Amino acid sequence: MWLWWIGWLALGGCAYYSFTGAAIPSHLQTIAIPLVEDRSNSPFTNLDQQLTELLIERFVNQTRLTLEPDPEAADALLEVRIDRYTNEPTAVGGAERAERNRVTITVTVRYVDQVNDQVLLERSFSAFEEYDPVAQGLAGEEETARLVLRNLADDIFTAATSNW
């Protein structure tokens, strides 16, 4: 009899938790992820598209949610805005030249359960990475920005799908 109850409780948790570690309420079946809004002063014009694609990849491939193109028809809505982009020296060498630069991107996220009209997550995220501006130049900054976006997508996904 005890084994039956333990099995029942274990299976009951599966309605909310997936084996990828993503906890999604069982009544949510679809998610809309509109194009990320970019309010930053980044020299790269496609940060919004890159972050949108990274988020879609995570939420669709690592959960049971399906992508809904119409935000009003989706069970869940993930809205993201890039608020700030900085590229600042962190180490200065001879002749006052930057030897290391840090790219920092700050975003604001709002994740809403539209079925129950409940905000599941609303907060800012910030991530940074460093590169060598002398050796890597603008291409190094661009690659570093891509890495920062990947880190942000991971952080957003983890926060939105974790219960802790």
Question: Which residues make up each language-model segment?
Answer:
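A structural "domain/chain start" motif
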Residues: 8, 14-64, 69, 87, ...
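Second-shell loop/turn segments in exported
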Residues: 37-45, 135-145
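Bacterial N-terminal signal peptides that target proteins for export
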Residues: 1-6
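Compositionally biased, intrinsically disordered linkers/stalks adjacent to structured regions
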Residues: 141-164
